[in-house]
Swiss-Prot record:
This is Lantipeptide prochlorosin 1.1. Residues 1-65 form a propeptide. Signal peptide: none annotated. Lanthionine-containing peptide (lantipeptide) with unknown function. Does not show antibiotic activity against Lactococcus lactis 117 and Bacillus subtilis 6633 bacteria. Organisms that produce this peptide live in oligotrophic environments at very dilute concentrations, suggesting this peptide is not secreted to influence other bacteria. The gene is ProcA1.1. Transmembrane segments: none annotated. The lineage of its organism: Bacteria, Bacillati, Cyanobacteriota, Cyanophyceae, Synechococcales. There is a cross-link at T77-C81 (Beta-methyllanthionine (Thr-Cys)). It comes from Prochlorococcus marinus (strain MIT 9313). NCBIfam families: leader_Nif11.
Length: 81
């Protein structure tokens, strides 16, 4: 269930400039922001997403911009462009 929650949260962030601004703030707590937005994700979900590599098919489907999760321990940042 958490993987689906993370994917839904990422989709919401890509469409919501308010969430993007919250996540861009220095020291933003991604898990807390997701929870406040109604999503249930964990730091483990973020770590797993960060380690995941894209397949050739995924790379072919990229239309621009990027999503990146960075950090250590409980501190993660999301870059949305």
């Amino acid at each position: 269930m958490s993987e689906e929650q993370l994917k839904a949260f990422i989709a919401k962030v890509q469409a919501d400039t308010s969430l993007q601004e919250q996540l861009k703030a220095e020291g933003a707590d991604v898990v807390a922001i997701a929870k406040a937005a109604g999503f249930s994700i964990t730091t483990e979900d973020l770590e797993k997403e960060h380690r995941q590599t894209l397949s050739d098919d995924d790379l072919e489907g990229v239309a621009g911009g990027f999503f990146c999760v960075q950090g250590t321990a409980n501190r993660f940042t999301i870059n949305v462009c």
